């Protein structure tokens, strides 16, 4: 599946191979790496996992291929992921980080209710959402 983000987004998003490697590394934390598809067409990928230490789910990655951005796929995928986590009910919140300066990511996650929690790490801004 040839997925790629826009050139200006490359510094902010992990390559899909790294996403899969991260899923394997976090397999003990019930990691979930998924391809996002419309019909038979791959439009993106996502990765999330459990984090008992934080009493939260961690959304490690969510990206939509550059050719399909702006069509609502990211919003729909995030809504489905969050609904599944709410139904599961193992943890009360979701935590994510985005690279400082990635205003598109910040705005995207804010529209879905995520708020900065000021537990930032190096050049990454941490946000969370109460389920």
Stretch-by-stretch model annotation:
Residues 80, 107-108:
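Structural preference for long, well-ordered alpha-helical segments within the folded cores
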Residues 126-131:
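Terminal substrate-recognition subdomain of acyl/acetyltransferases
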Residues 1-60, 65-67, 78-88, 116-122:
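Acetyl-CoA-dependent GNAT
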Residues 65-71, 100-101:
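Active-site acidic-Proline motif in GNAT/NAT acetyltransferases
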Residues 109, 114:
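Conserved active-site tyrosine of GNAT-family acetyltransferases
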Residues 85-97:
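Conserved GNAT acetyl-CoA-binding A-motif
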Residues 95-106, 122-124:
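Conserved beta-strand-loop-alpha-helix junction that forms the acyl-donor binding cleft
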């Amino acid at each position: 599946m040839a997925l790629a983000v826009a050139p200006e987004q490359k510094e902010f998003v992990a390559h899909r191979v790294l996403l899969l490697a991260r899923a394997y590394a976090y397999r003990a934390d019930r990691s979930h790496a998924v391809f996002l598809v419309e019909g038979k067409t791959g439009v993106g990928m996502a990765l999330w996992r459990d984090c008992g230490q934080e009493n939260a789910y961690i959304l490690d990655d969510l990206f939509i291929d550059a050719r399909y951005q702006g069509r609502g796929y990211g919003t729909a995928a995030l809504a489905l992921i969050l609904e599944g986590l709410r139904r599961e009910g193992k943890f009360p919140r979701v935590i994510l980080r985005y690279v400082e300066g990635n205003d598109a990511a910040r705005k995207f996650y804010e529209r879905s209710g995520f708020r900065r929690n000021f537990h930032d790490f190096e050049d990454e801004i941490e946000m969370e959402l109460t389920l």
